[in-house]
């Protein structure tokens, strides 16, 4: 249901800050010279409601039609998320100016990368710096130069009819009109030369190379387009975990795609480093920490000729546990494709730790009980903690779900109706469960 939920607005971005970024001379006056941009597109019905389609006819920036914004005549920072259902955006400015990319999905690059165009695929994030110094009283447009996209890249197609037809297909269009005003006090007017020293993963330290495939399959039911796009020759099954990854494993994932279409591949749990795309090292803007990588469509092909598959390799360290109850996922970040089954699951196991703790009892108490405000949880064994907490009512209906909860200030249950409830705790180390009953009065 991802396409439907994103269409209706359940999608956005989170800004994560740290001491290294805070020490840099970067714009950070939120809404003045530090501006988040969520890019998407929508189709409107005759009653001006969103319709659920892969491509909309109208560009929306921060959910605004024909968006414009006033920025100061200095260096301006845009934190950009491609939140579209499917479309990629070939970003550039109407006057051809350069802009500097300073982050990829997972954080700062070693140094700003100056470009005039950048293709941002579904789910990807970048931050850019644009120098507007000395330009007060002028204006410029941030545009999508999608007429330049290949026909097998989302947004580069030109469908005249059918479910994928849309006004913006294979066209250039405005994303944001910028009116440049006066410079602010304490303005940033220069772009730093260096940002951080990333320590990337070394392929020589990889424990394994996992080989994944992307392919097309025709004739499957409930598929909107002519092809179903599938991972590892199967559609998603929520009860099946494809891989068991040992905790702290460093792994190379090698994805070979015979699909005619390009797919932004996303993995949960980790940030990774791209090793190569079709044998070529990543560009400087892609050489940092990533969690989305574009897998190009195959090249060539035709009657009797399958074409040449594309091959993308990345390396990641899996340092966070995930059991079969809460597996991590990997999928195409085009929502329609993942909804139709282009997705898989994996667990990250720590067998030794689980075996050592398997017979450890979970002794826990709840207080005050009854309660009408907050419920506090105390583990008798100080080495134990909560991995997951679920609260259900007497009919078995889930009322509260708390992954890795902070318990110091208690759990707010004031919104629950009076009655009896069951609280189930999954212990963090052993992954064993215990259930306690409490009363809301």
Residue ranges and their predicted role:
Residues 4-40, 110-262, 269, 274, ...:
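Extended terminal and domain-junction accessory segments
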Residues 66-68, 114-118, 240-243, 290-305:
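Beta-strand-rich interaction surfaces with strong enrichment in secreted/lumenal proteins
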Residues 355-367, 371-441:
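C-terminal outer-membrane/trafficking sorting elements
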Residues 274-299, 304-307, 314-317:
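C-terminal soluble interaction/assembly domains
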Residues 30-75, 79-85:
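Acidic-aromatic/histidine active-site loop/patch
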Residues 74, 249, 326, 331, ...:
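A glycine-anchored, Pro-Gly-centered beta-turn/N-cap motif
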Residues 72-75, 247-250, 369-376:
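Short coil/turn motif common to extracellular beta-sandwich-like domains
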Residues 81-86, 217, 256-260, 380-384:
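Short solvent-exposed strand-capping/beta-turn motif centered on an Asx-Ser/Thr pair
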């Amino acid at each position: 249901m991802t396409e439907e939920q994103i269409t209706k607005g359940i999608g956005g971005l989170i800004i994560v800050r740290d001491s290294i970024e805070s020490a840099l001379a970067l714009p950070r006056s939120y809404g003045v010279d530090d501006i988040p941009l969520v890019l998407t597109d929508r189709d409107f019905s005759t009653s001006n409601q969103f319709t659920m389609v892969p491509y909309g006819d109208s560009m929306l920036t921060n959910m605004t039609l024909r968006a414009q914004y006033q920025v100061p005549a200095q260096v301006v920072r845009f934190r950009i998320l491609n939140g579209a259902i499917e479309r990629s955006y070939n970003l550039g400015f109407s006057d051809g100016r350069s802009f500097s990319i300073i982050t990829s999905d997972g954080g700062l690059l070693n140094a700003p990368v100056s470009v005039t165009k950048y293709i941002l695929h579904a789910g990807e994030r970048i931050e850019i710096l644009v120098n507007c110094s000395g330009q007060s009283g002028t204006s410029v447009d941030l545009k999508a130069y999608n007429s330049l996209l290949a026909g097998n890249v989302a947004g580069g197609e030109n469908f005249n009819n059918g479910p994928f037809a849309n006004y913006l297909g294979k066209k250039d269009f405005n994303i944001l009109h910028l009116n440049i005003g006066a410079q602010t006090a304490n303005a940033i007017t220069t772009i730093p030369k260096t940002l951080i020293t990333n320590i990337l993963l070394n392929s020589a330290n990889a424990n394994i190379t996992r080989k994944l495939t992307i392919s097309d399959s025709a004739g499957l039911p409930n598929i909107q387009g002519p092809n179903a796009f599938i991972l590892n020759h199967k559609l998603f099954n929520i009860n099946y975990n494809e891989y068991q990854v040992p905790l702290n494993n460093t792994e190379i994932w090698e994805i070979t795609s015979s699909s005619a279409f390009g797919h932004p591949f996303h993995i949960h749990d980790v940030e990774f480093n791209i090793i190569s795309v079709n044998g070529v090292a990543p560009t400087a803007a892609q050489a940092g920490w990533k969690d989305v990588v574009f897998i190009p469509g195959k090249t060539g092909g035709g009657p009797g000729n399958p074409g040449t598959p594309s091959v993308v390799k990345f390396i990641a360290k899996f340092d966070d546990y995930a059991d079969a109850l809460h597996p991590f996922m990997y999928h195409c970040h085009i929502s329609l494709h993942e909804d139709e089954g282009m997705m898989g699951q994996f667990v990250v196991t720590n067998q030794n730790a689980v075996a050592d703790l398997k017979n450890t009892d979970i002794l826990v108490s709840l207080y005050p009980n009854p309660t009408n405000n907050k419920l506090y949880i105390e583990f008798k064994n100080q080495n134990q903690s909560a991995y997951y907490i679920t609260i259900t009512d007497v009919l078995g209906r889930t009322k509260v779900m708390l992954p890795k909860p902070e318990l110091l200030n208690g759990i707010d249950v004031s919104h629950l109706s009076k009655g009896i409830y069951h609280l189930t705790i999954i212990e963090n180390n052993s992954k064993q469960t215990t259930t306690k009953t409490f009363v809301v009065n």
